[in-house]
Amino acid sequence: MVIRSVNLETVCGITSKIPDNPFNEVAFAGKSNVGKSSMINALLNRKSLARTSAQPGKTQTINFYNVNDAMYLVDLPGYGYAKTSASEKEKWGKMIENYLHTSKKLQAVFLLIDIRHDPSANDKMMYDWMVYQGFTPIIIATKLDKIKRSQIQKNVKVIREGLKVKPGTVIIPFSSETKQGRDELWEVIDSFVLPQEETEEEDK
C-alpha cells in the first residue's frame, strides 16, 4: 500500500453521532498499553499522527483516519486501564458497541494483543464480545521486536490458545519499531476494503 494522503477526519466522543462515511472501514481495538497508536503510525508511515503516550488509556475517542480518500482506519478507545473509573469504562464500552452496531461501512475488526504476554481477561472478554457481535477478529500480535525470533511461534500459539480463536483466524506478528508484519497487515486490510479488481491490480 502506497500512502499518498492521511487525514484524521473525524473524532467521536461519548455523545457523538457515528459518521456515515463514503468509504469502507477497518477498526482496531486493544488494551490501553498494547501499542495501538504506535502500530497505526507505523502502518501509515507517520511518526506522530496517532498520539502515543507513556500514560495508558490516552485514546478516549473513536478516531477516523481517511487514507488515500479510499478507506478509513478506525482507532477505538483502549480498554482495561486499571485507573479508569467504572463509569468511564462503561461509557467507552457503550461507545464501541454503538460504533460496531451503527457503522454501515465496517468491514473488519482487528484486535491487538501483546505478543510477550498471555491474553488478559479483558482481551478474552473483548475477543468473545466481538465474535458475539458477528465479527471474526484478526489478531495483531504487537511488540514483536521485544522477543527473540525463536519465541515467535510459541508465543503466537499461546495467544491462539488463550483466546480460543475460531479456526482459520489470522494472527499477524507486528513490530512498530522495525515494521515487520506491516506488508502482511496491509494485504489483509486491502482484502477487506478495496474492490477486488483494485486488489488484483496491486498484486501485478
Mark where each language-model region is:
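Conserved G1/Walker A P-loop phosphate-binding module
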Residues: M1-K83, L194, T199-K204
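Canonical P-loop GTPase G-domain recognition
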Residues: I3-T15, K146-K204
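Helical mechanochemical/support elements of P-loop NTPase systems and associated helical scaffolds
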Residues: P22, S48, T61, E88, ...
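Hydrophobic aliphatic residues
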Residues: L43-K47, L100, L163, I189
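Conserved nucleotide-binding/hydrolysis micro-motifs of P-loop NTPases
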Residues: K58, M71, G78-Y81, R116-D118, ...
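Conserved nucleotide-sensing/catalytic segment adjacent to the nucleotide-binding pocket
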Residues: N68-L106
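Conserved C-terminal guanine-recognition region of P-loop GTPase G domains, centered on the G4
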Residues: E97-T169
